[in-house]
């Protein structure tokens, strides 16, 4: 699902980006694509495939001035995380060196950076936004 939906979204737009001579693609990966997780192999495996797709497309599309990157969010304050019992949240926070979960704005800012001219020479990167949890 993760890779197929990304491919279905990217392929039609690549033609337009090539014609205009530039473009920027930012995929959504996950922290677990870089470090794995204990339970369930499907999600980290599919997100690892997103990373591979990102790296390959960066190499393939770079000559057309199309940058391809991904953001790998860590635990983020979403409705799903907010619904977890407090006794589950506190150990998660303790495992994050910044001692907090990320906010949606933290993730959005990573996307904004990669989409901006400040990242004009950044391609093929998986940007972790996880408070250093995976280190």
Language model features with spans:
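Alpha-helical segment proximal to the catalytic Tyr-Lys
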Residues: 15, 55, 59-63, 120
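Conserved Rossmann-fold SDR core element
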Residues: 51, 61-76, 122-129
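Active-site loop immediately N-terminal to the catalytic Tyr-X3-Lys motif
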Residues: 35-41, 63-64, 99, 117
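Short, flexible catalytic-loop segment of classical short-chain dehydrogenase/reductase
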Residues: 34, 72-83
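Residue(s) in the substrate-gating loop at a strand-loop-helix junction
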Residues: 30
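C-terminal helical subdomain
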Residues: 7, 70, 93-118, 122, ...
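Active-site helix of classical SDR
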Residues: 10, 46
